[in-house]
Regions:
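Glycine-rich, histidine-containing beta strand-loop boundary motifs that form or position
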Residues: 33, 41-43, 91, 102-105, ...
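Catalytic and substrate-binding clefts that recognize carbohydrates or anionic sugar/phosphate headgroups
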Residues: 1-161, 168-169, 174, 181-186, ...
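Extracellular structured ligand-interaction cores
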Residues: 82-86, 96-98, 106, 129, ...
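A conserved hydrophobic secondary-structure block that centers on an alpha-helix together
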Residues: 77-78, 154-157, 167-215, 219-221
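Catalytic core of carbohydrate-active enzymes
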Residues: 75, 379, 385-401, 407-418, ...
Length: 670
């Protein structure tokens, strides 16, 4: 059951698609406080949700703020990342209630989940105008399903989007891109996508192509597509200020950009320097901006990634000028003391980026109402995704277009996926990737993944391999790195190349199961990844597991995420069949009883556990998804007590939007 409560005069967010009547009764489970709501947690209570946030699967023990942020350093001390996902799923503990809480509010929401008082959960919106949904059901899976129905079907990408994507900030020419494709082919490594960062643009301006570096983008796209590889270019939120650029000129002439208090366009700098920012909260602006993608779809482009759309701001001219003036004043001093150096010089420079004062200095038009940006800040990136998603429905009707974004809000999951932002090449970030996935998907973002190997810093060959051994299970599987870091395309690691090749081929072999699991999750509002406690709520050990995930109906994964480890502890809430896999054709199996185990797992092995009564369809590996044969399958299985094992498999053309036809489903029995 879903109950809806309204407070004040909420601004529209378009997060939900179901019309739930407003309830006049008391809010269940929660206690009203002066500035928000509270819930008293039992010692064994667990709090899931909040999507893209730091720390573990269980969010208890920390405080958070949903405030979409261009956060370059991912660490446990952070309060927010790129997405605002205000859904909590509370498992109250033995003999207590389970319920979901969705706070539909476009500004900051602050959470204290056992941080100040370990038995107290508190949350408060920055303004008194919001909607609150309370969801109850039979169990955690049922509550999750109801929430997903409330917010609408998750975005479904083309099937080729489940292949490997190779990306880097630093592919500067068409020949660089060709070389990546050539090396993958020569090293017999499967590949479906090459992502282009901002170097393909002319002067970092959206919807332009640098003709010297990429003289014929359409020909390059066609050349790679003939090899089964799609080009996936980036689009940033800031529109470069250039009166000669038709996108800038048209947006300015029609008043499509966000404005300052005096009505003039708001200006801030990002990669191209000074830029304007489209007012994505207006439908006509979304239609206009979405129309610009045609310049690239006309070149044969079928996929995009939207970036810098929190929106990230490097500086505003006004605050940069004030900073320079303060530095000029300091430069006249003979001695700059510690507080002045760290406070005014270092702090002043760092404070230019993503400054709260800048976010409070420009405005949107929301249904004819002028609204200051910081009040609706979290809607911005999601509405850029919406602009693109709605455009693709017009530009490529009946066809699927790949789209994923850095910034998001619940509701934008209907238009595109997300990647988990600018992580780092550390083992801690691998664990963070594992722990973030179920909560992100709980909030509707099914097509999700992290930058494999890590985006910043220099990765190591063993980290690249271990991360791939988890990444081969995530819907979005992309290797991405920043300019200046170690080159980390998989063919670069000579010593690890045989193992990396086998793991990439394993991903493609498992696609019949992974794609079927994804489509079931999207079409039936079930989960792709979920914590063990969802299926085993009465098992206290299962509820506490933070580093194993259930994958669909029939599989559990337990990645190795520590350096130099040759195995790991695994908890099985029921008997399962272990597949210790070195390649599609080289694996050991062992039936393990329920309980605690130490399982050996060499650096070139991955652990896959199949639950009783379930089977996993396995194809022959392929060089790209287009060459995958879904008809010649082997079944890996764990028969139940009756000796049977089965799976539901989904097959379609992978390109069109005809999802619901029943003939796409069939049952396979081992």
């Amino acid at each position: 059951m879903i109950q809806r409560f309204r407070f004040g005069l909420p601004l529209p967010t378009d997060s939900v698609v179901q019309e739930i009547p407003v309830s006049a009764g008391p809010v269940p489970f929660l206690t009203a406080e002066e500035d928000g709501w509270a819930y008293r947690m039992a010692p064994d209570a667990i709090v899931y949700g909040l999507g893209e946030m730091p720390r573990g699967i269980n969010k208890r023990g920390w405080h958070y703020v949903t405030n979409n942020t261009d956060e370059a350093r991912h660490s446990e001390d952070k309060l927010s990342y790129y997405g605002a996902h205000n859904f909590l799923l509370i498992d109250g503990g033995a003999g207590r209630e389970c319920f979901g809480v969705f706070i539909d509010f476009p500004g900051k929401v602050r959470y204290d989940i056992g941080y100040t008082e370990y038995d107290a959960l508190r949350f408060a919106t920055e303004e008194p105008d919001y909607e609150l949904y309370i969801i109850t059901g039979d169990d955690l899976n049922d509550i999750s399903r109801q929430f997903r129905q409330l917010i609408g079907r998750s975005y479904i990408p083309p099937k080729w989007a489940f292949g490997l994507a190779q990306s880097r900030f630093g592919y500067k020419t068409a020949e660089d891109v060709r070389e990546v494709a050539r090396q993958y082919k020569e090293n017999d490594l499967p590949l479906d996508m090459i992502c282009m960062d901002i170097d393909y643009m002319q002067d970092y301006a959206d919807f332009t192509v640098n003709k010297q570096r990429f003289p014929d983008l359409a020909a390059l796209s066609a050349e790679l597509k003939a090899q089964g590889i799609r080009l996936v270019p980036i689009i940033d939120a800031g529109v470069r200020i250039d009166p000669e650029n038709p996108v800038c000129a048209e947006g300015l002439a029609n008043g499509y950009f966000c404005t300052k208090a005096d009505g003039t366009p708001f200006v801030a700098a990002v990669w191209p320097g000074k830029a304007y920012f489209a007012d994505f909260l207006r439908p006509e602006v979304r239609e206009w901006f979405g129309r610009q993608y045609k310049a690239l779809t006309d070149c044969g482009i079928e996929g995009f990634w939207n970036d810098m759309n929190e929106p990230a701001l490097f500086y505003s001219p006004e605050r940069l000028k004030a900073f320079f003036e303060s530095m000029d004043e300091l430069s006249r001093k003979d001695n700059i003391v510690q507080d002045e150096f760290f406070g005014k010089v270092v702090g002043g420079a760092l404070g230019l980026m993503n400054a709260p004062e800048d976010y409070a200095s420009f405005y949107h038009d929301v249904d004819g109402q002028r609204v200051r940006h910081d009040r609706v800040h979290n809607l911005y990136g999601g509405n850029m995704t919406r602009a693109a998603g709605e455009a693709f429905a017009r530009l490529r009707p009946g066809r699927r277009t790949l789209l994923y974004s850095r910034s998001s809000f619940i509701g934008s999951h209907r238009y595109g996926g997300i990647w988990l932002g600018d992580n780092a090449s550390t083992w801690a970030q691998l664990l963070a990737n594992i722990q973030m996935m179920p909560n992100v998907q709980l909030c509707g973002f099914l097509y999700t993944g992290a930058d494999l190997c890590g985006f910043s810093y220099d990765t190591t060959p063993d980290l690249a391999l271990r991360w791939l051994e988890f990444g081969l299970f995530t819907p979005l599987m992309r290797n991405h790195a920043t300019d200046g870091s170690r080159m980390q395309e998989y063919y670069r690691f000579a010593d690890m190349l045989p193992a990396l090749r086998k793991m990439l081929r394993l991903r493609y072999a498992l696609l019949p199961y992974l794609y079927s699991t994804f489509m079931k999750a999207a079409l039936e509002n079930t989960s792709y990844f979920r914590p063990l406690g969802f299926d085993f709520p009465a098992d206290p050990d299962a509820r506490e597991v933070q580093d194993q995930l259930l994958l669909g109906e029939g599989v559990m994964v337990a990645p190795v995420y520590t350096q130099n480890a040759s195995g790991r502890h695994v908890y099985l809430p029921e008997a399962m069949k272990l597949y210790r896999i070195r390649s599609v054709d080289d694996y050991d199996t062992e039936l393990l009883p329920a309980g605690h185990h130490y399982v050996r797992c060499a650096l070139d092995e991955v652990l896959l556990f199949i639950r009783p009564g379930h089977a996993v369809p396995v194809a022959r590996p392929a060089s790209c998804t287009a060459q995958l044969d879904d008809t010649a399958l082997t079944l890996w299985a764990c028969p139940d007590e009756n000796g049977s094992a089965r799976c539901r498999m989904y097959t379609d053309d992978g390109e069109t939007s005809d999802f619901a036809a029943p003939e796409h489903w069939k049952t396979l029995e081992a």
